[in-house]
Amino acid sequence: MSQGVEFNRLMLDMRAMQMDAMSAPKPVSGAQEAGASSFADMLGQAVNKVAQTQQASSQLANAFEVGKSGIDLTDVMISSQKASVSFQALTQVRNKLVQAYQDIMQMPV
């Protein structure tokens, strides 16, 4: 029986929190926070990070090919796969963005 009482008390507390949240004033969503970065900035950073990963992988592969000491084949392969996966993920994001743009453009006005 005490579980039923605890459950009822929990439900009452949740409803009270819901009412408080609904009655609280909501901030204006049009103004962007000073420290917040835009989607374009975040996308640009992602593209730059993928480019850096590919460049590091290429440099590691070149160092292995010329026989530089301390470079292991497993490190080269892991770096190459990281670059490949990050590029594929970026390509998928691009495809989703293009598809979303096309869907929006095809909407009737």
Curated annotation (Swiss-Prot):
Positions of transmembrane segments: none
Compartment(s) where it occurs, according to its Swiss-Prot or TrEMBL record: Bacterial flagellum basal body
GO cellular component, one term: bacterial-type flagellum basal body
InterPro entries hit by this protein: FliE (IPR001624)
BP-aspect Gene Ontology terms: bacterial-type flagellum-dependent cell motility
Record's keyword terms, sorted: Bacterial flagellum
A GO term, aspect molecular function: structural molecule activity
Pfam hit, one: FliE
Source organism, top-level taxon: Bacteria
PANTHER family: FLAGELLAR HOOK-BASAL BODY COMPLEX PROTEIN FLIE, PTHR34653
Annotated family: Belongs to the FliE family.
Protein name as catalogued: Flagellar hook-basal body complex protein FliE
Organism: Pseudomonas syringae pv. tomato (strain ATCC BAA-871 / DC3000)
Designated gene of the protein: fliE
